[in-house]
Amino acid sequence: MLIYYTSEFSRRYKRLSQDIKEQAKEKEKIFCKNHFDPRLKTHKLNGTASNYWAFSVDYNYRIIFKFYEKNSVIFIAIGDHSIYKDF
């Protein structure tokens, strides 16, 4: 599984607290093994963001991503629920 990171994702990630960064790393490990592990609550987005998917880092934080090629994804953004309005 290859994961690519957009500059937007990297910029938002740098601003997160250390606790959220650690949780995100753990969820990324789970994601690499199984995109649809129930602990991630992976879901497809709707409306203008229907090409994107998201999974939960914790109750408030999400990672938005897009499937890319056969065995890779692009992490687009990370943040609280307000990131949905950017799509």
What are the functions of these language-model segments?
Residues S17, D37, T42, F75, ...:
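Generic secondary-structure boundary/loop-capping signal
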Residues K27-I30, H81:
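Conserved short hydrophobic interaction patches
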